[in-house]
Amino acid sequence: MGLELSAQQQASLLDYLALMRKWNKAYNLTAINDLEQMVIRHLLDSLSILPFIGSSPVLDVGSGAGLPGIPLAIALPHQQFILLDSNGKKIRFLTQAKIDLALKNIDIVHARVEDFQPTAPIAIVTCRAFAALNAILDSTRHLLTSTSRVLAMKAKQEDTKLPAGYEQVAVHELEVAFLDEPRLLIEIKII
């Protein structure tokens, strides 16, 4: 992956996983409980899109337990991230994670994506395990400008035609260390 993180960033990522494991008992944040698998399937998977995060703000739609938003925010402390979710329990977890990890570069928003009205243009929309590609595009259309990008993390390419007004920029094959499963990043813009 070629990723270089400081000792403090590495510690923050592990603290994040510890917090997720603690809250998972009551809040059902993830089906993955094994620490090694959490590192691979949550942290490394989320961080695999780092090379594609250029400008900010970055909106993490359907953030859930904060994936990929929190690992990206830890790795990119000078970028601004907005973590959006409609589930109150997940918002409580995200808020606590922001406090415990002292993440000053994230904002937590409790709303449905269709209802979210940002105060500044969104540069990048990320999503991981959120919805089918066309549903993602339909629900985020009002957030996109001509320079915005949607970065949809998928396990496989969907055989769907993009709605009118969208162009697929690229399909990036992601390499996640210790994971022998396909991971794709589908990059889309409006035209």
Predicted features and spans:
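Class I SAM-dependent transferase core
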Residues: 1-55, 59, 89-92, 96-106
